[in-house]
Curated annotation (Swiss-Prot):
Gene: copZ
Pfam families: HMA (PF00403)
Organism: Enterococcus hirae (strain ATCC 9790 / DSM 20160 / JCM 8729 / LMG 6399 / NBRC 3181 / NCIMB 6459 / NCDO 1258 / NCTC 12367 / WDCM 00089 / R)
Task performed by this protein: Acts as a copper chaperone by delivering 2 Cu(+) ions to CopY Zn(2+)-bound form. This transfer results in displacement of zinc and dissociation of CopY from the promoter, allowing transcription of the copYZAB operon.
Induction, as annotated: By Cu(+) and Cu(2+).
Annotated protein name in UniProt: Copper chaperone CopZ
Length: 69
């Protein structure tokens, strides 16, 4: 599945790298691309292994505000 997430609170490329690294480590995530200027993340993942809510939670735990769009 491919899902877009709104991500608020990012200010630089380091923020992008932190999110991509953290989400990329989640079992079932195949690809993650974070876009700083658009304040969003696009994640491809296997729904059998992970849910969109878990991805949001991982981003939120880093101190950003994520939600499914």
């Amino acid at each position: 599945m491919k899902q877009e997430f709104s991500v608020k609170g990012m200010s630089c490329n380091h923020c992008v790298a932190r999110i991509e690294e953290a989400v990329g480590r989640i079992s079932g995530v195949k690809k993650v691309k974070v876009q700083l200027k658009k304040e969003k993340a696009v994640v491809k993942f296997d729904e059998a292994n992970v849910q969109a809510t878990e991805i949001c939670q991982a981003i939120n735990e880093l101190g950003y505000q994520a939600e499914v769009i």
